[in-house]
Amino acid sequence: MELLCCEVDPVRRAVPDRNLLEDRVLQNLLTIEERYLPQCSYFKCVQKDIQPYMRRMVATWMLEVCEEQKCEEEVFPLAMNYLDRFLAGVPTPKTHLQLLGAVCMFLASKLKETIPLTAEKLCIYTDNSVKPQELLEWELVVLGKLKWNLAAVTPHDFIEHILRKLPQQKEKLSLIRKHAQTFIALCATDFKFAMYPPSMIATGSVGAAICGLQQDEEVNALTCDALTELLTKITHTDVDCLKACQEQIEAVLLNSLQQFRQEQHNGSKSVEDPDQATTPTDVRDVDL
């Protein structure tokens, strides 16, 4: 007789600390957030071999890996922050882009995960085009170029600060949070958001989430102007900039959904093994 233990230990999480949601913490985040942004639009002045569509493809692959491995929500945006900062300073051949993406996920998971991704597992996701030793060597290269500044501010750092100030029922906040996290992940796949302050992306994502849910009457109704005014006060964001950011976020979601539906209609959806993301693909899976 063979006994199988199928119990899985849940991830141990600390009790929420209200001190971390005080206004002084929010102000500190707003003060330092721009230190961790790419210093230039690197496709124009640094990268000669890498094109925007290549970044989008590797970003989508990274997102699929993070989703399949059930990584914390912060891991993917943080990994993309590392990737963009590295590419903003180091000319990189396109043949090394997936290796760079794997290294960035490796570093981000070490910072945010209880059990980080292993080098061997990440190499499997590259279809073994990257070797573990190569990944470990590049880890040191990336760390050096980033000057070991890994604790970057991401949009997720602002989500709880924003949600706790909203006039919404507590049970509705989890739904708003989930939608906002989806928008943040989508923004990370699109280079146009790479140089936006994280607070702007977080505020726009929450605004887009609430507006979308209000159409389905899932949350308390607020006029668009009232919601925008409230959000700008929380993160000290310019009203016009926030409106423009939110419109761009909604456009990115609409475009990705239309693209997915078109792929389904044309019958071009891949029929390969869906259990392992080995090749970068277009953005198509957004769980709302």
Curated annotation (Swiss-Prot):
GO molecular function annotation: cyclin-dependent protein serine/threonine kinase activator activity; cyclin-dependent protein serine/threonine kinase regulator activity; protein kinase binding; protein serine/threonine kinase activator activity
One Pfam short name: Cyclin_N
Main location: nucleus
Residues with Phosphothreonine modification: 279
CDD domains: CYCLIN_CCND2_rpt2
Keywords tagged on the record: Cell cycle, Cell division, Cyclin, Cytoplasm, Membrane, Nucleus, Phosphoprotein, Ubl conjugation
Domain of life of the source: Eukaryota
Classification via InterPro entries: Cyclin (IPR039361), Cyclin-like_dom (IPR013763), Cyclin-like_sf (IPR036915), Cyclin_C-dom (IPR004367), Cyclin_N (IPR006671), Cyclins_cyclin-box (IPR048258)
Record's function text: Regulatory component of the cyclin D2-CDK4 (DC) complex that phosphorylates and inhibits members of the retinoblastoma (RB) protein family including RB1 and regulates the cell-cycle during G(1)/S transition. Phosphorylation of RB1 allows dissociation of the transcription factor E2F from the RB/E2F complex and the subsequent transcription of E2F target genes which are responsible for the progression through the G(1) phase. Hypophosphorylates RB1 in early G(1) phase. Cyclin D-CDK4 complexes are major integrators of various mitogenenic and antimitogenic signals.
Name of the protein described by the UniProt record: G1/S-specific cyclin-D2
Organism from which the protein derives: Rattus norvegicus
Taxonomy of the source species: Eukaryota, Metazoa, Chordata, Craniata, Vertebrata
Gene behind the chain: Ccnd2
